[in-house]
Design a protein with these regions (language model features):
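Conserved GNAT-fold acetyl-CoA-binding loop/helix
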Residues: 26-48
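Conserved active-site alpha-helix within GNAT-family acetyltransferase domains
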Residues: 113, 125, 138-156
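Conserved beta-strand-loop-alpha-helix junction that forms the acyl-donor binding cleft
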Residues: 107, 119, 133-144, 160-164
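Conserved beta-hairpin
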Residues: 55-71
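Conserved GNAT acetyl-CoA-binding A-motif
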Residues: 116, 123-135
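A short beta-loop-alpha structural element at the N-terminal edge
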Residues: 5-20
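Conserved acetyl-CoA-binding loop-helix of GNAT-fold acetyltransferases
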Residues: 102, 108-121, 145, 149
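Conserved acyl-donor/pantetheine-binding loop and adjacent beta-alpha core of acyl/acetyltransferases
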Residues: 72-99
């Protein structure tokens, strides 16, 4: 059963709260020993979240008005996706999922899983795409297990200066 009282496409006035959620998530990851999203703590945002909000690609999941979680669903691959997915990024068949983040006040309540389940229904019905593609640091076993447990197929690894990334996709 979902804890969300609403799921909304983020509006520009949500941007400050969204960026705070991302920074808090990056701080939590750092405390857990992960450098994923570390750039956010230096004021760098490779996904340009405010612009993604303006494009209508950011979805927020609320519980009684509070943001419990968020996700970015990009209909067009960004430069990172094109680097990582190479020729597949140009097939037009997929949504690229980025910045799945859960408010730590909701930890342990399957919020991430609920966001992913919502996404798997929303993408084919509303965005008319048949594949979700995503990546995460290979060095985070729990995160890789999270996606495998949701039946995402591991399709390879990509490397950049920040590390090695596991690539996952799910055909819907």
């Amino acid at each position: 059963m979902s804890i969300f009282t609403s799921v909304e496409r983020a509006e520009p006035e949500d941007t400050t709260e969204i960026m705070r959620l991302l920074a808090n998530t990056a701080e939590w990851l750092l405390r857990k020993g992960s450098t994923q999203w570390n750039a956010l703590l230096r004021g760098e945002d490779s996904h340009n979240t405010p612009e993604a909000v303006n494009r209508g690609e950011v979805y927020i999941f609320r519980d009684e008005g509070k943001i419990a979680g968020m996700v970015i669903l990009m209909e067009q691959p960004n430069s990172w996706d094109r680097h990582l997915w190479a020729g597949k990024a140009e097939d037009g068949a997929a949504i690229y999922l980025h910045r799945l983040a859960v408010n730590r006040k909701y930890a342990g309540r399957d919020v991430g899983k609920q966001i992913m389940q919502w996404t798997e229904s929303f993408v084919p019905e509303q965005l008319h795409k048949g594949i979700i593609r995503l990546d995460c640091l290979s060095s985070i076993p729990a995160l890789n297990e999270f996606y495998r447990n949701l039946n995402y197929d591991f399709v390879g690894e990509g490397v950049n200066s920040s590390g090695t990334y596991s690539m996952y996709e799910k055909k819907l």
